[in-house]
Amino acid sequence: RTAEQTENLLVNTHATFRWKHGLFPAFDHDQMTALDADLYITLVDNVDAIHERLIREHDVPHTLKDILVWREEEILATEVMSRIIRGHGCFFVVSRGVERDTALSVYRLLFERNRRKVYPSFPMTHVINVPQILTQIDLFRNALTEHFITFDPGDMDEKRLLYEAGAATQRGERQFNIEVNNRRLTFSVDQVTSVADDIDGQIYARDFKLIDQSDMIVSFIP
């Protein structure tokens, strides 16, 4: 088998897929058990970034709600699979990153297993318009990334969609434009506000997941 002849093996696959509105597993349990992977990682990204890639690279009818559901299904299915096959502590959620590349965290999870895992805690919502504090926060985050595996809540920013939708509503507009993956996209205010509770709920749940998979929380209080 390839796995037996390879020192380091990465398997890139979905845990689930949908076909004709049905949900199906995208893996064979016997094969995954035989493979007995050391680590299971679900890479996640902002809903607007996934939407942009879908319309650019694939012909897949979808809504923002669909993307949020698919993402949650992937996380849950992968975690369940990892626990059944490998046990607790072998599954991680890692963000692709908005302003920074998180590939280093993945590398360290794979090859520097003794390095401590950290959840950086810092103010976000209430300091958006305070540049001096934002600079301090960036220095804090960068310092942690230099020394630890970081599961940074700031590596995803879906609140931006909700803020932009709210601003458009105040202007009396039904659509708004934002830049996503270096491309200007138009979003419907109604479509974004219809998933506001889902976005907030998943942010809340994801933060707990990132904390749970960390060894410690390091807080910055400006």
Predicted regions and their residues:
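Conserved catalytic or regulatory cores that recognize and/or transform ribose-phosphate-containing ligands
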Residues: R1, Q5-T6, F17-H21, P25, ...
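A mobile, often basic/glycine-rich helix-loop segment
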Residues: D30
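Structural recognition of the conserved hydrophobic beta-strand(s) that form the central parallel beta-sheet
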Residues: L9-T13
